[in-house]
Amino acid sequence: FVDVSRKKIAAEVEVEMAGLDVSAERKKEIVERRLRSEINRGVQTIQYQVVTLMTTNGQAPFITVFMYLGEARNPQEKADLAIIIEETIRQRYQGVKNEAGVWITPAFPKLIYVLEEDNIRPGTPYYYLTELAAKCTAKRMVPDYISEKKMKELKLSKGETPGHGDVYTCMGCRSFLTPDRFTDAGVGNIANAGNYEPGKHKYYGRFNQGVVTINLPDVALSAGGNIEKFWSIFDERLELCHRALRCRHDRLKGTLSDAAPILWQYGACARLKKGEPIDRLLYDGYSTISLGYAGLYECVKYMTGKSHTDPSATPFALSIMQKMNDKCKEWKTAENIDYSLYGTPLESTTYKFAKCLQKRFGVIEGVTDKGYITNSYHVHVTEKIDAFTKLKFEAQFQHLSPGGAISYVEVPNMQQNLEAVLQVMKFIYDNIIYAELNTKSDYCQVCGWDGEIDIVEEGGKLIWRCPKCGNTDQDKMNVARRTCGYIGTQFWNQGRTQEIKERVLHL
C-alpha cells in the first residue's frame, strides 16, 4: 500500500510540476514528504478508531499489531514496512489525548515488535527501530517482543530442523497457533483463503476454538499433598477439561458461514459459500483448541513446600507441564483436533479461582492466602529475582506452552536508562520466544500528577490514590497497568488489584 501511494503521489507531483524547472531529486523529496504525511494520518486514524470503537460488551477491540520486517517480500517492501513501523512506534510513544488534553498511554492496539538479525545490534540496518522501540517501551509499556531466533528454533512443523521454524504473531495477547500441519499434509486451501500460497505455511486467518482452564492449586489441595493422589486427581481433572473442550468444539460443529459473514465468507477466517458449514475448519490443524492452566507456583508450593524456582522443585513443575502436553498430544492424535497447552492469563478469573480455593480449603499460607493465584507458570509476583534470571527460568516453561504464553519483567521508570532496556531486549532475543517489560503510566486529572498512582487499603478495600493530592475518584485519573498480556486502563477487581500492588521490581 505504501508503494501504491508513492506512485499515486508521484503522478500528482508530475502534473503539478509540469513546465517547471524542478529536478528529479527535488520531486522525489516532495513525494517522500507527502508519503510520510499520508502514513502519519493513516496510522493515527487506526489508533483513534481502535480506542474509540466499542464492542458489544463495552470494551475496545482486543487488537494486536505485528511488526515483523521478515514478512517483507523484497528490499523496497522492507524499507516501506520500516516506515510504517517507525510511525506506529512514534505515535504510541506520543500517546493519545485524554479529556484534559494530556497525552496518556492507550491500551490498544497492542504492539508486538520482532527482534531479528537485521535490528538487534548496533550497526544492523534497522537498529534505529529497536532503539525507538526501547524508548517507547520505557514510557508506554509497548511494544512487546518476539524473538525471531527462538521462534525459528522452537516453532517447528513436521520435518523442520531448529533454526528453520516459522515466525508468526500470537492471537490477542498470547494465544499461539500450532505450526501449520495441514499444508504439509497436502490438505490444500480448505478455507478457500485469498492469502493461501501452495506449499507455504499459513497463519493469518486461522483461529482458536476456545479455552478451558484447569486450576492446578485445586488439584494439589484436593490431593492433600499426597503425590500418588495428585497424579490420579490430575488425570481426572484433565479428562473433565477434555469433556468441556469437546463441548466447545461440538457447539461449533454445524455452524453455518451465515452466522458471521465477515469471519466465514468475507475472508477474516475463510471464504466459504453462503449456507456452508464451517466444520472442515475445525480439523486438520487449521484451528486450535486450548487446554489452559493456572497457578503452577501455588500447586508446586503446596506439594513440595518450595517455589518452583527452587532447583529441587523445578523438575516436579516441569513434569506437570509435560503431563498436560502429553494429554494434548493424545487427544490430538485420536481426534485430529489441534489441542494445545495455553498459559491462561486469568485477567479477572484469578480472583474467582482464589476465592473458590479459600472457600473449599481455607486460608493456607503461601498457597491460598491471596486474592489471586499466579498467572500460568510465572514466578510469584512477590518473589525477589532479577530480570535475566526470571526470563531464563521461565523460558523452559514457555517452550512447554505451545498454545500460548508470555513472560514479563517488572521495571521502574527506565526513560533515563534506555541502555538497560536494550540489554533486556537483547536477552529476550537470545533466550525466550515472547516477553514484555512492565512499568507504570498514570495521570491524575485533578492535580496533573503524572507519576505512579498508589494502591492503598482503606476500610478493608484496595483503592487507587494520587500521592500528590489524595484524589481517589477513578473517573478523574488515568491508570495504565499490565494486566497480564494486555495493558489495562479500566481498573480491576480486588484480587487483580492486590496482585498488581504486590509486584516486586526485577531490575
Descriptions of predicted regions:
Residues V211, L216, Y286-S290, R481-C484, ...:
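Generic secondary-structure boundary/loop-capping signal
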Residues M67, I289-Y302, Q322, R482:
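Contiguous, well-ordered alpha-helical segments that form the cores/surfaces of helical PPI scaffolds
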Residues I39-V43, Q47, K301-Y302, R496-E502:
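Metallocofactor- and cofactor-centric catalytic cores in central/energy metabolism, strongly enriched
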Residues G470-L507:
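Long insertion/accessory domains within large nucleic-acid-processing enzymes
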Residues G292-G295, G403, G485, G495:
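Glycine-centered flexibility sites
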Residues F1-G285, K306, D310-K468, T472, ...:
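Conserved catalytic cores of very large enzyme subunits
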